């Protein structure tokens, strides 16, 4: 009869198992937090401004950022690498500003980006936000580098 699971044994199994998995959860949470903090570039005021520009203009309604968002326009999580300006903040701001100023291009039958009335400071902030996003260690996600 000692093989029967009594109420007290069942309670002990439940509490013991619960405590074990809570400890595992807390440990994995701490490990994940430490990993993200150590591999993500630091936020600057320009990056924060760029994130606000990104959100205020609802860029995610057309673009994806690391696979999140709409698939109407190109992925922009790696756009600075594709343009070859990841390591040059001035060239990145100039490239993005020139692209945005040229929109919409007026080419018939092609998806068009609306013209946003952004200041030079906002364009610089947006380029810094996209450079920051491009420098994140996404562990090769999304798998499509073409954008």
UniProtKB/Swiss-Prot annotation:
The chain crosses the membrane at residues 13-29. It holds the Pfam family Cytochrom_C. Heme c binds at residues 59, 62-63. GO terms for molecular function: electron transfer activity; heme binding; metal ion binding. It comes from the Bacteria. Heterodimer of cytochromes b (large subunit) and c (small subunit). This is Nitric oxide reductase subunit C.
